[in-house]
Design a protein with these regions (language model features):
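ATP-binding/phosphotransfer module of carbohydrate and carboxylate kinases, centering on a glycine-rich
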Residues: 1-58, 62-67, 71-127, 131-132, ...
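Short glycine-aspartate micro-motif
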Residues: 79-83, 133-137, 201-205, 211-213, ...
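Short beta-strand scaffold segments in enzyme catalytic cores
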Residues: 81, 89-93, 188, 211-215, ...
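Short, small/polar residue-rich loop motifs at catalytic or cofactor-binding pockets
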Residues: 87-88, 207-209, 229
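Glycine-rich phosphate-binding loop and adjoining helix at the ATP-binding site
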Residues: 100-200, 298-311
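Active-site glycine-centered loops adjacent to acidic/histidine catalytic or metal-binding residues
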Residues: 182, 207, 333
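Short, intrinsically disordered, charge-biased short linear motifs at domain edges
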Residues: 227-236
Length: 346
């Protein structure tokens, strides 16, 4: 029975993923999913009964009767997602399509502690509750354990050591909570909205810190302890500035020093060098740039990264700034909740 439940859930997720891209017919679903027409019919009937899909119009296909179009009922299920930076909390409400319906932003005091954070999170969430809400996702500063919901030693946050944040948030909110690194939720956002077109990608988040989210063969890569992506704390300059992590010469520290001193060209070149190393190491074909530093100077960061990437014709890499803007981490945290119910394993 568990295997049957898994198969149903997987097939449902495949069909819903295709429906997120626009109206589709049952024939489209069978051709694009690899499922049999009989399996598609069963899945579609189940999703219609659950209010997730609706029949909406027809499409003429030449000879024969028109085919019925199926449309995702995007607002049938909702989720909240939060981005926690070292100085700000952002909460967004998203639907099944990954569209942001509402948002709230509040400053966080210097060196905020867990009780103060949970209180502010609860205040913002209470202002955005909805009967169709499935849960709350948190995109937090690492290192943390995605599986246990514990924040271990959040870089730059001195009062966050082995904090059971998921448990604290669930107790306060009375809702299911999912915790992950901010870089991971950001890449989840891109993968959720793009579906199968995004398979091997890195998302570079340049905000108060610097890290990457990794999508490898269509799956978010978290590593053995769910802390993959701490790329900002790899060394790029042996005699470089001290970093908040305690080391010296980290990519994050060198970048931030250049940015604070007004050396935009130097800051973007450092990010470009780091991204080029990732591309060479992982052989990804897509790079997404995100975070407040990038959004403040998008063209400069795009140029800085593109200038450092390999130029071989057989090694094309697409580089872009996230279309989700400031919401990418929080929206991805919400989509992580949605994927727990209606997505493939991420």
């Amino acid at each position: 029975m568990p295997n049957l439940r898994f198969l149903r859930g997987y097939n449902d997720a495949v069909v819903l993923g295709l429906a997120r891209s626009g109206a589709v017919t049952r024939v489209d679903l069978a051709e694009r999913s690899g499922l049999t027409p009989q399996a598609v019919s069963k899945v579609v009937a189940r999703l219609i009964d659950e209010g997730l899909l609706v029949e909406s119009g027809t499409r003429n296909v030449g000879v024969g009767k028109p085919r019925t179009l199926l449309k995702l009922v995007a607002d049938s299920r909702l989720a909240l997602g939060a981005q926690v930076e070292r100085d700000e909390l952002r909460v967004v409400l998203t639907d099944l399509a990954g569209d942001v319906l509402d948002r709230a932003v509040a400053p966080l005091p210097p060196d905020f502690d867990p009780p103060a954070f949970v209180a502010e999170l609860t205040r913002l969430v209470n202002g955005m509750r909805d009967d169709k809400l499935l849960g709350v996702g948190l995109g937090f500063v690492g290192p943390l354990d995605h599986r246990t919901g514990v924040v271990h030693d959040a870089t730059g946050l001195v009062k966050w050591h082995d904090v059971p944040l998921r448990e604290l948030a669930e107790d306060s909110l009375g809702l299911p909570v999912v915790l992950d690194k901010d870089t991971n939720t950001a890449i989840v956002a891109e993968a959720w909205r793009r579906g199968e077109e995004l398979r091997d990608a890195v998302l570079v988040l340049v905000g108060t810190g610097l890290g990457v989210g990794l999508l490898l063969d269509g799956q978010v890569y978290r590593g053995a302890r769910t802390n993959a992506g701490e790329f900002g704390h790899t060394t790029i300059q042996l005699d470089g500035p001290e970093c908040v992590c305690g080391r010296t010469g980290c990519i994050e520290a060198v970048h931030n020093l250049a940015a604070r001193s007004g050396d935009l060209a130097g800051a973007t070149a450092i990010v470009g060098l780091a991204v080029a190393d990732l591309v060479q190491l992982l052989d990804v074909d897509h790079v997404v740039l995100a975070g407040r530093a990038v959004l403040a100077q998008p063209e400069a960061y795009l140029a800085g990264v593109r200038a450092k990437l390999p130029t071989a014709d057989w090694l094309p890499v697409e580089v872009e700034v996230t279309p989700l803007g400031d919401d990418v981490v929080a929206a991805g945290a919400a989509m992580l909740v949605l994927s727990e119910f209606y997505g493939r394993p991420r």
